[in-house]
Design a protein with these regions (language model features):
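Interfacial loop-to-helix junctions that mark the boundaries of transmembrane helices
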Residues: 1-10, 110-122, 145, 176-182, ...
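Helix-loop-helix hairpins and the membrane-proximal interhelical loops
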Residues: 1-49, 148-195, 213-216
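Hydrophobic core segments of alpha-helical transmembrane domains in multi-pass membrane transport
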Residues: 11-24, 56-60, 126-137, 150-162, ...
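Short helix-coil transition sites and intra-membrane helix breaks within transmembrane domains
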Residues: 16, 27-31, 60-68, 164-167, ...
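Hydrophobic alpha-helical transmembrane segments of multi-pass integral membrane proteins
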Residues: 46-72, 186-209
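Membrane-embedded alpha-helical segments of transport systems
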Residues: 62-69, 88-104, 120-126, 155, ...
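Membrane-interfacial helix-loop connectors
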Residues: 72-94, 102-122, 197-234, 243-249, ...
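Cytosolic, long alpha-helical scaffolding segments
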Residues: 82, 108, 219, 245-251, ...
Length: 565
């Protein structure tokens, strides 16, 4: 047994592991640093396709994987946060963003003459500095910076290990023969690229390994071109797998990614094959790591430029491939489950959890949606009482069912998000959101209780006096404004809105006490029937409790603002 060969194989395997782990740590740190900016970037998608491309490129540059970005897009489309037209731009941009890693890796080709400039020279120092920041720094931002630095250091150490383990064998005939076969057979090269990328689940990682081989001068241009084209197609595998069990549109998003990359590979692969036929010297030229970076970037930018005007065509093609359900299938699906529960299950798509910062933003967005449902229920219940409206009573019951489902799904989702790798600040937000959904659900319960009183009022033909109706209108309007401001404070993280809630809640308490005393006077003077009076006082009490829950929401926001200071 050749001990040296075994040792080099171990070194190569360790190098791959270190490279992949370093890239993962670096991406995780960058993603945490990006935080809620992810949500703002997604908001830009509604403007135009060019901005969507830029956003896709930026997000992928952060998370270092076009496949991961597309998985996130599949999750957004599945949850109804993004249309297919918006998604196609992000998918195109993702292919550009993933080339950043290739440029970082290409720095490793700096020669021994300038060893002091080689990233691997500084890699151990980077790991050391990063580890100190992660282990001993108390500030979250410094810890994130430490993760990024450690990741970069490990990435370059891994590349150096791989390069060093291969260097003794660069003159071996097996390398030249292997790349000669791959270069002369485009389909084989593309297949190798697809398989390696599918296994590693990252085109950035597979391109990095190819560049390591190129640094040692064993990769021919034709082989590199075809393998790179395959790597682009291989990056689609992650999204395709993740689209299983999603909506038709989510499957179409994954399909568009595949169509886009296959189209690019066909166009460039055909062109490259023809070029190499007329320029055989170029085909067998040993490509450098930097040249792979140039080709990788050039290929993706040109493909995006060519295909961008045909984004709508990609959407149509994906619709032809992934057809709508037939009417019978749709009916069977609806009969199988609660349609609103099915819709909510798509809202809380587990694919979004792969991007923790986005998952946190999604949690907040869903809490706001739940809050607005409870706000609607306050309005419905007030209308039911004021107008003896049976339709409004039915609406309250329907909305309360939705709020209960939201509480169930949101609680499960928040538990999952809280277990992700998120910042301390995000953990505090998630804990407050747990409290928020309890208050929001209780408000909807109170609305249902008030609708029960409205039903009792209708069935027993109870009529409030004109004074009583005016008093209820005045109090209910304040409660609606109070809860609306509480939702605004939670959504916008607004101190002004939170202070408004506290002020209005005090006014509600004072007004409720005043109206209660006035009504007791009317009961004492015989202007109101005792049976009517009990219902009226119960409604006052319910409205006051609703404002208490609004105040709880505002107090959480004010506490978060104080904590930040």
């Amino acid at each position: 047994m050749n001990i040296e060969l075994v040792g080099n194989l171990f070194m190569f395997a360790g190098g791959i592991g270190m490279f992949l782990y370093g890239m993962n740590i670096m991406a995780d740190g960058m993603q945490k640093s990006a935080g809620s900016k992810m949500k703002q970037l997604i908001g830009y998608l509604t403007r135009n396709r060019l901005l969507a491309v830029l956003v896709g490129a930026f997000i992928t540059a952060i998370i270092q994987s076009s496949g991961a970005t597309t998985v996130m897009v599949v999750g957004f489309v599945n949850a109804g946060l993004m249309t297919l037209v918006q998604a196609v731009g992000v998918i195109m941009g993702a292919n550009i963003g993933t080339t950043i890693t290739a440029w970082i890796v290409s720095l490793g080709q700096l020669g021994d003459a300038v060893k002091v400039l080689k990233p691997s020279f500084y890699a151990p120092l980077l790991v050391g500095i990063g580890a100190i920041l992660v282990l001993f720094s108390k500030k979250p931002k410094k810890k994130m910076a430490g993760e990024i630095v450690v990741g970069i250091g490990l990435l370059f150490l891994g590349l150096d290990f791989m390069s060093e383990s291969i260097s003794p064998y660069t003159d071996a005939p097996i390398f030249s023969k292997a790349f000669e076969v791959v270069g002369s057979n485009p389909l084989l090269g593309i297949a190798i690229g697809i398989v390696v990328t599918a296994i590693l689940q990252s085109s950035s990682a597979s391109v990095g390994i190819l560049q390591t081989l190129a640094i040692n001068g064993v990769v021919t241009t034709n082989a590199a071109v075809f393998i790179t084209l395959g790597q682009n197609i291989g990056s689609c595998v992650t999204a395709i797998i993740s689209s299983a069990g999603t909506t038709r549109n989510a499957k179409r998003a994954a399909c568009m990614h595949l169509l886009f990359n296959v189209a690019g590979a066909v166009i460039f692969g055909t062109g490259a094959f023809i070029l190499f036929m007329f320029k055989p010297a170029l085909a067998v030229h040993n490509i450098t790591s930097v040249e792979i970076s140039i080709f990788h970037t050039f290929f993706n930018i040109i493909c995006t430029t060519i295909m961008m005007p045909f984004g709508s065509l990609l959407v149509k093609l994906s619709g032809i491939i992934i057809r709508e359900k037939t009417e019978d299938e749709e009916n069977a699906s609806l009969e199988a489950s609660d349609s609103y529960a099915a819709e909510l299950s798509r809202h809380f798509d587990s694919r979004i959890l792969e991007q923790p910062s986005v998952a946190v933003d999604r949690a907040l967005s869903e809490v706001i949606i739940m809050g607005n449902l409870s706000l609607d229920n306050i309005k419905y219940s007030v209308s039911a009482v004021m107008n003896n409206d049976q339709d409004m009573i039915d609406k309250v019951i329907e909305t309360e069912h939705k709020v209960d489902l939201y509480e169930k799904y949101l609680t499960e989702y928040l538990i999952k998000v809280n277990n992700l790798s998120i910042t301390e600040e995000q953990h505090l937000l998630i804990n407050d959101l747990f409290h928020a959904i309890i208050d929001i659900e209780r408000v909807s319960d109170h609305a249902e209780n008030m609708s029960d009183l409205a039903k009792y009022k209708i069935d027993n033909e109870i009529i409030f006096s004109q004074h009583g109706m005016e008093e209820l209108k005045k109090l209910s309007e304040k409660v609606i404004v109070c809860f609306s401001e509480a939702i605004k404070a939670r959504e916008k993280f607004s101190r002004v809105a939170a202070d408004n809630v506290c002020r209005i809640e005090d006014e509600v308490d004072d007004l409720e006490e005043e109206l209660r005393n006035k009504h007791i006077e009317r009961l004492s003077s015989g202007l109101c029937k005792p049976s009517n009076g009990v219902v009226f006082l119960d409604i006052l009490s319910i409205l006051e409790r609703m404002s208490d829950h609004a105040n709880n929401l505002a107090d959480c926001v004010l506490a978060e603002i104080k904590e930040k200071k």
